[in-house]
Amino acid sequence: MPGSETQIWVKRDELTGTEVSGNKIRKLEFSLAEALEQGCDTVITRGGLQSNHCRCTAIVCSRLGLKVHLILRGDKPEKPAGNLLLDYLAGAQITYVHPKDWDGHEDLARELQEDYASGGSKAFFIPIGASDEVGLWGYIAASEELNKDFERLS
């Protein structure tokens, strides 16, 4: 800042260069590694109709050869647009849950896991936004990365 000794540094995760840029990929990296380690062939996750987390999950699963099933809060629109369109283009299977029924979406996720298992698949469940003890490692890694950046740039 002009005339000040204060420095403001910004880590621009959205500029990492792909359609899955941004902070969502940090947590997803660890969640999907866990899914692969467990031998899963399908990933189930949930979010809103325009969820960035769901978009990233669908695209990365497509690249990894994993099936993805999204549970989305909202009614199916006539024409998908935005992230929802990208979900479809990435090959996601989508179940829509009306907002008034959203409280039961965790039960639906468990039912889907059982359905996939009965069909011979193994499904890994990622909570909304990969906000769990596995996804947390993405931000632990980010803080280590920032420390290295500070050391290098100071």
Language model region names:
Residues M1-S154:
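PLP-dependent amino-acid enzyme catalytic core
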